[in-house]
Amino acid sequence: MRCPYCGHLEDRVVDSRETQDGQATRRRRACLSCERRFTTYERIEDVLPQVVKKDGRREAFDRAKIVEGVATACQKRPVSTEQVEALVSAVERQVQELGEREIRTAVIGEAVMQRLRTLDEVAYVRFASVYRAFRDVGEFMTELAGLARKDGEER
């Protein structure tokens, strides 16, 4: 494994364990050159469906895009990297279980929002504001009112 800090190709595994969802192996590694530590995740490569974008373009399912979007929404929130990984793994599993050859971005986005809402409501609102591309403050306020209403019903 190439060290992300110095580029050296040799390292040693310091710790190895399964992630919470059991879908990957998390490994802490130490570079044999610069001695800095870094984390890698190992998972089985699955055949995932093509993603159909809003404009009709198709591209390969990209887990990293979902991780990036969720991590951005969770910035400065009490959400760990492991929680982000678990959320993305759950979405990825849901997509696989559908068994479709193609999936619309809307299905993926809704799955992410559903899980984010239970994880952290502020992160949910951040993600929804970008994903749903609110045109004005009124649409944003409507979403917040819906969130508050659903919270009231759950309590």
UniProtKB/Swiss-Prot annotation:
The record's keywords, sorted A to Z, are:
ATP-binding, DNA-binding, Metal-binding, Nucleotide-binding, Repressor, Transcription, Transcription regulation, Zinc, Zinc-finger
Give the GO terms filed under biological process for this record: negative regulation of DNA-templated transcription
Q: Which residues form a coiled coil?
A: none
Q: Which domain of life is it from?
A: Bacteria
Q: Which cofactor(s) does the record list?
A: Zn(2+)
Provide the cofactor note recorded for this chain's UniProt entry. Binds 1 zinc ion.
Q: Where are the zinc fingers (unnamed)?
A: 3-34
- UniProt GO MF annotations: ATP binding; DNA binding; zinc ion binding
Where is the ATP-cone domain positioned along the sequence?
49-139
Q: Which InterPro entries match?
A: ATP-cone_dom (IPR005144), NrdR-like_N (IPR055173), RNR_NrdR-like (IPR003796)
| PROSITE patterns registered for this protein in UniProt | ATP_CONE
| UniProt key word Nucleotide-binding | yes
NCBIfam families, from UniProt? Answer: transcriptional regulator NrdR
Job of this protein: Negatively regulates transcription of bacterial ribonucleotide reductase nrd genes and operons by binding to NrdR-boxes.
Hey, which family's this protein in? Belongs to the NrdR family.
| The protein, known as | Transcriptional repressor NrdR
The organism's taxonomic lineage, starting at the top:
Bacteria, Pseudomonadati, Myxococcota, Myxococcia, Myxococcales
